[in-house]
Amino acid sequence: MGQTLSRADYAALYGPTTGDRIRLADTELLIEVERDLTIPGEEVRFGGGKVVRDGMGQSQVTREAGAMDTVITGAVVFDHQGITKADVGLRDGRIAGIGKAGNPDTQPGVTLIIGPGTEIIAGEGRILTPGGMDCHIHFICPQQVDHALHSGVTTLLGGGTGPAHGTLATTCTPGPWHIARMLEACAELPVNIGIAGKGNASLPAALEEQVRAGACALKLHEDWGTTPAAIDCCLTVADAMDVQVMIHTDTLNESGFVEDTMAAIAGRTIHAYHTEGAGGGHAPDIIRMVGMGNVLPSSTNPTRPYTGNTIEEHLDMLMVCHHLDRRVPEDVAFAESRIRRETIAAEDILHDLGAFSVISSDSQAMGRIGEVIIRTWQTADKMRRQRGRLAGETGENDNLRARRYIAKYTINPAIAHGISTHVGSIEPGKRADLVLWSPAFFGVKPEMVLVGGRISVAQMGDPNGSIPVQPIFSRPMWGHAGRASALFLSRAGLEAGAGDGLGKALIAVEQTRGIGKADMVLNDAMPQIEVDPETYEVRADGELLTCEPATELPMAQRYFLF
C-alpha cells in the first residue's frame, strides 16, 4: 500500500528530489535538483529493515553477469552538466552508469544491478561531485598530496623536483633524469599525477627528450627566460608531440610586451597561468589574454577572491617565491609591479562572466594546495552577493553560476590537458574519482573521497572506539594507495616505456592541440580587454570592471575551529 510523504519527510529519508534546493555550505548559493533518475517507492536504501537485502533490492546476479562493484545510492550528482538525483554504479574503478540501482527481478526500471558482490555507499542527503583537478602544482614536498586529497582534489599536474630553488619558483621538472625520478616518486602517491617538463629552450632537442621521458606538458616560465624564440620552439614541439604548453610570461617586459608574446604564440593553443598577473606575467596588461580565442586562461588561488588582505599578503609571498631581496631596489620594484588591486578586482568579475576558465593553486609558490575548491566557491559567493543572479539563470536557484564555477576545477583543466576522457565529470567510462559532501560542509571538508573507485580518505572517528565516534576528522582509508590512481604521460613517453614497472595505471594525454577558449565549458567568454597603463583600470568591451574587496567570507573560520 502506497504512502504519501511530505517533501521534507521524503528529503530526510531519501535525499532531495526534483525541485528541492540545497544551500552550498554557508554561502548564498542555492542549487536545485533538475531531475531524478530514481523511482519513488523503489529507492534502494541500505540498512537493517531496509531495501538492499537478498531477494529484495539485491539480486542474485554475479559480477561476471553485470552486477556493480559499488553503488552510491540516492546522491545529488553535481558537475558542469547539471544537478541530478541518481544512483551511481562503479565497476573496475570507473563509473559504469548513472541511473536507477536495484534488483531487476523485483523492481522496475533498474539500470544498475545490485548483486551479492556489490558494496553500498549511502549517498542520500549528500552531494556527489567529480574529484577536483589542480593543474598548477609546484612539486615542492610530497606532503602536498594529502592536503590536496583531503580537500577533494584527486588529480595534480605540474612540475618540480622538491625544494630546489628552480622548483620553488617554477613548475618545471627539467630533463629526462629528473622526470624519471619524479615518476618513480609518484608511483606510491594516492592521487593522479602528470609531470610537466621545462619548456624554455630555443632548439627542440632538449624539449623532445623530456616529452619522450614522459612529460605530459611543457612549462614556459619567465625565471628561465620566456623569450619569443623559446615560446615558438616550445609550441612547435608541443604541436608535433601532442602535449600542452603552460606559460608564465615576462613580467619585466624585457624580451617583449604582451603583443610580442601573442605574435610568438601565433594563434597556437596555450594555457596561460595566473592570467591576471599577480602571479606573474606582462605588467600591467597580461589580463588581455583572456580575450584571445587560442588562450586557455587560468587563475591561481591566492587572488581568489579579492579581499581586504589580498594586496598586503601578496607582496611578502612574491619576495619569497621568486628569490627576491628587499635590499635590492629592482627586486622591490619587480614585486610591486605585479600586485595591482585594479586587475585583481577585475579578475573576480571576469570569472563570473566566464572569461577566466580555470582555477588552480600555485602550491607553496604563492598558492595553497588545499584551498582550490574553497576559494573557487568563495569567489562565486562574493560575486553572487555583489552582482546578483546571472542573466541566464532560470528559477529560484543559482544552478548556472554553480555549474560555471565547478567547471573551473573539474572539466576545464581536464580538457586543457588532454585527460577529459578519464577525469573531470561524472559520466560512464570515466575514472571513479569522486567526492561525497554533506551540504553543510560542501567545498570545505569532504565526507569521503574515492580514487579509482576506492575510498581513499574519509571523515572517521576514533579507531579504538566501539563505533566511529569523536574525534572525527579526515583520515586515510584502505584505498589510500598508489595503485588506485594513475600517471598521465605523453603518448611518446608511453610508447618509449616511461613509467614501465611502476605498478601504476599509465594513461596518455591526447587532443591537447587545436583546442581553444570555445572548448572551455561554461567559461568561454572572450571580451575585448583594455588596461589603462597609468591607472591599471580594466575594461571589458568598454565596460569598467571593478568591485569592492570582501571583508568577510563564507567557508572560513567557522569551519576550522578544530
UniProtKB/Swiss-Prot annotation:
Gene3D superfamilies: Metal-dependent hydrolases (3.20.20.140), Urease, subunit C, domain 1 (2.30.40.10)
Top-level taxon of the source organism: Bacteria
Compartment list: Cytoplasm
Pfam families for the chain: Amidohydro_1, Urease_alpha
Sequence positions that bind Ni(2+) 1: H136, H138, K219, D362
Family label: Belongs to the metallo-dependent hydrolases superfamily. Urease alpha subunit family.
Pathway participation: Nitrogen metabolism; urea degradation; CO(2) and NH(3) from urea (urease route): step 1/1
Cofactor: binding comment: Binds 2 nickel ions per subunit.
Binding site for Ni(2+) 2: K219, H248, H274
Keywords in alphabetical order: Cytoplasm, Hydrolase, Metal-binding, Nickel
Post-translational modification (record): Carboxylation allows a single lysine to coordinate two nickel ions.
PROSITE patterns on file: UREASE_2 (PS00145), UREASE_3 (PS51368)
Reactions it catalyzes: urea + 2 H2O + H(+) = hydrogencarbonate + 2 NH4(+)
Requisite cofactors: Ni cation
Annotated EC: 3.5.1.5
Protein name (Swiss-Prot/TrEMBL): Urease subunit alpha
Binding locations of substrate: H221
